[in-house]
A protein has these predicted regions:
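Charged, amphipathic alpha-helical linker segments immediately N-terminal to NTP-binding catalytic cores
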Residues: 151-196
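Long, low-complexity segments enriched in small/aliphatic residues
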Residues: 302-304, 308-348, 352
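Glycine-rich phosphate-binding P-loop
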Residues: 217-239
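Short beta-strand-centered segment that lines the nucleotide-binding/catalytic pocket of NTP-utilizing
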Residues: 244-257
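Active-site-adjacent "gating/activation" loops or surface patches in catalytic cores
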Residues: 180-219
Length: 355
């Protein structure tokens, strides 16, 4: 459910997204509140070679990041973005990474021309008037500009300006490149903020555990993308352990902001407010909690559409692919692969669900 986006406004945006074809409404009985979105075939994943840290010097960008001179980057990006909003609606998204008003939280504002971005950010972050009220007259917020432009991969850039608290993304409409609160802010910009303020932004899950004696422990764990963070974060204790009183709960499945407390211990929050999970391989056995979370108010991206019941399907969901379906590129698919043509990609290289 969207947090901070009024129900009436949310319904209007969802209806507009379906009217324009940007999204498809799914079966309200089987998947209430769920939508399907397809990106262009050339825009299906984060693009690390087009992602830049535009710090004052290359040394400040870090050894594993791409660097671009800030002045050069601003000129290039504004030349690409100029006039790209003509004839389009501009949406303004004030959002909080972390609970609104928490001393651990940070605020950002994203401008975008994509309803898909608005509806996803309403799931993944806390948005709305409370954020603006909390910000007040402070200048401590992250500026974000997203321009879909023409989805031209040759002019696609995702640039972070840590010294300016600024993010600019152009020529993409894929989640990881355009939901600027995620990797762009919560990891890249936040890493610089943490360096200045003595805390850490980490690509880590947070998991709570309680034993039968009532002792509670929390763990953080770092895996690369699509390597099991969400599955571990949403772990359910085996029946034998459940019967003995062991409990596990998910605090976060992707990003941790970690601080040292006054008692010398480490404290972490999940700055996000939803889940942006990898769909393939998610099923009743591998991650029943994640699957249950997708059963309502979820935005699916680049998965197959089952035309018989207007639901979605992806690789690994079950062993019964739909025989009357549309793949992630909008092409008819009969649930089979072709040895002559190779496997028909019914889901894209990085299909997602946002719940």
């Amino acid at each position: 459910q969207s947090r901070g986006l009024g129900d009436v406004y949310k319904r209007q945006l969802r209806a507009k997204a379906c009217e324009t074809g940007e999204m498809t409404k799914l079966n309200e009985d089987l998947l209430p509140g769920c939508l399907l979105h397809r990106t262009k075939p050339n825009d299906v994943a984060r693009v690390e070679n087009r992602t830049f840290i535009c710090a004052e010097s290359a040394d400040q960008a870090g050894p594993t990041n791409n660097w671009m001179d800030p002045a050069e980057a601003y000129k290039m990006l504004y030349d690409i973005a100029r006039d790209s909003y003509k004839g389009r609606t501009m949406y303004i998204i004030p959002y909080s990474m972390g609970p609104v008003g928490s001393p651990f939280s940070k605020i950002g504002v994203e401008l975008t021309d994509s309803i898909y971005v608005v509806l996803n950010m309403a799931i993944m972050t806390r948005i709305g008037k409370k954020v603006m009220d909390t910000l007040g007259d402070s200048n401590d917020w992250v500026r974000g500009l997203h321009c879909s432009c023409d989805i031209d991969p040759e002019k696609r850039y995702i640039c972070q300006f840590p010294q300016d608290n600024t993010i600019i993304s152009v020529n993409s409409a894929y989640g990881g490149n355009v939901l600027l609160g995620k990797k762009c802010f919560a990891l890249r910009i936040a890493s610089y903020q943490g360096w200045k303020e003595s805390w850490q932004a980490e690509h880590m899950l947070i998991l709570g555990l309680e034993n039968p004696k009532g002792e509670v422990k929390y763990i953080c764990a770092a895996f690369p993308s699509a390597c099991g963070k969400t599955n571990l974060a949403m772990l359910i204790p085996p029946e034998g352990y459940r019967n003995k009183g062991y409990k596990i709960w998910c605090v976060g499945d992707d990003i941790s902001w970690i601080r040292k407390g006054p008692d010398g211990r480490l404290y972490a929050i999940n700055p996000e407010n939803g889940f942006f999970g990898v769909a393939p391989g998610t099923n009743e056995k591998s991650n029943p909690n994640a699957l249950a979370a997708t059963r309502k108010n979820t935005i699916f991206t680049n998965v197959a559409l089952n035309l018989d019941n207007n639901t979605v399907w992806w690789e690994g969901l079950d062993k019964n692919p739909p025989e009357n379906a549309i793949d992630w590129q909008g092409r008819p698919w009969n649930g089979k692969t072709s040895e002559e043509k190779g496997c028909l990609l019914y889901t894209s290289p990085s299909p997602r669900d946002c719940s």
